[in-house]
């Protein structure tokens, strides 16, 4: 755990005026003044017909931190830990957990948007410094944002320029040589233009000790820089806003250890990197035509990412001495029950055969060759265009409407080195061109000032072109079908401080083609997954209490899950990913979130999530049989490789290491399910 000391210095235009005053009175909680930026229509939090958690005022005291520090405050929101900062999110148990070089095209379940720019699976560049609002919407949001939000949406809104000149400087010190700084300056001009400049830096050694590199604490360091310039001009007819963002997160990556990081110690002799450099430009135009408003948004981004890691998790000396190491004893204890079950209750030594045979096998193994490293780089260019027509809600219309068209172009090239396609290749050079196009709308009827019925829809198609630059003959073109999503909602205010809503939504996650050219033909494709979401909830608030609670039920038809086959038990990198469809599934649960404010300086938060889920595989139960029981054997043969190695000590000894790779539920305790080496449901964590 890191300890922090913070210092904030306010900068006024005259450098002599006191620009901040505080009142001892308690500022009342209000939902009506909190605009929800991720909604199609302009609504406040108190009128939102969705299960959501919205952060705004509390972000002011978290400016030195990252979005990952908010995650525990959102019920039923999780993330996969296989990166230096969260990239892959799950909401209500549905979401992506990884995307290695050979895992196919991007297919996020939880959309992530920064100032109108889609950064799904690229969201590690989201520090909370100078952030106006963070919105997390739970459940199916495909009518709002398309297939990228089939499980939910995370929306970030940074502060706009203001009319007052001034700014502030923030610095924060912490343990492990953590040093964070931030600078904001706001500058209005006489011609009506306003400029806001923001800079933020965070450096830290990390908190893991690498004993192979001389007790080094910097193998998982963080070097993060974010720069932002925002220009705004508001007119009676046209409002223009331009946002330019540069982020460079150059972080080390040294997370995995055979003992599950029991003491935050790693043994890798070749630590990796987890970095992302992003350049983003966003142009927003708002045309106020009186009865109607026209919004036009254009976004362009370039993102260069690198993910690499020491995939044997150790070093030569570590593996040579692994048999007698204390960590091995602990590891044996951890898995003793499994070995005992597999070997009729014999003790751990008996499970691995006699000592002579163990020593012989141990001596024969070439530890010098047990050295693996994986790396993949991506260059990602995105372009988005969104044109939206909506009624002016300031006119208190009986009927409000929104209609729009949207298109995104996603271009990616990937260069990978290591064991690719389950060890069938040592390198990979590929590319994707993905075009998503949609038209959408929402119609809302306001019965009175207290209740609204709304119907929303979206028609969307996604076309994928895949290029294999190594000419393996695995190029493909997928012309996606048009899919329809809809949402019907009703919300009302039974009393002045109570809000109730209910909605039914249907969405989808798109079909695709598995990238691995060595898969059997029956495993090359998978179909759309259809979602049906029914949610009801309440919001209750007083001057010092805000409480929300919801109940949800979600059904899946053609549930997409990701299978993994470990092809070589002696090589922790020899695994192959592919997606398939289960028959159906469902989940239900509840989400509760609250804030209890005792004073302007003291408050208490509440976050409670509960979920139960079930997947029916039907005809897919024989999937393991079709693949020689490889997938099912992740729970048997690869947990105890006795069948493959006849009880040899190294067969089991290093299969214990393989067990760590194959069964990352243990790693999941520390890292929210590392995704690289286990058989798992893609979004059923």
Each language-model region and where it sits:
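N-terminal periplasmic "start-of-domain" segments of outer-membrane beta-barrel proteins
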Residues: 31-62, 87-90, 110
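Transmembrane beta-barrel wall of Gram-negative outer-membrane proteins
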Residues: 166-168, 173-204, 208-252, 277-283, ...
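Membrane-embedded beta-barrel scaffold of Gram-negative outer-membrane proteins
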Residues: 284-288, 293-311, 493, 499-505, ...
